[in-house]
Amino acid sequence: MLLARTRLAPWTLLRSLHAIEAEHGRVRETRWGARTLDLDLVQYGVPGTPGEHVVTDPDLLLPHPRAADRAFVLEPWHLVDPEAVLRVGDAVVPVADRLEQLDRTGVRPGPDWRPTW
């Protein structure tokens, strides 16, 4: 999970994520197929604020349509931003509250990439 501020438009950011995936050997042949790297744009802006982007294009759906149902997305998100909120339908919900409703079996933290100096 990466939280970032950017001046890139959502489409430009998505193209950049796809380019990074390709640099790491990802080939987009089969939807939901095996992949070497999977970078998703989950949300753009904070729900309920002027910076929020809701996009309903077949190639870019924001917020990510399945993020609210995936503990493997919400768990690391909550770890890096305990105050995070996400849009679920018309509601804006704390990630922590949504996470409590999901089965977290098999979800475990990855390596800690923070600098140790």
Regions found by a protein language model. Give the residues of each.
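Short, charge-patterned binding micro-sites
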Residues: 1-5
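Flexible, gly/pro- and Lys/Arg-enriched active-site loops
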Residues: 8-117
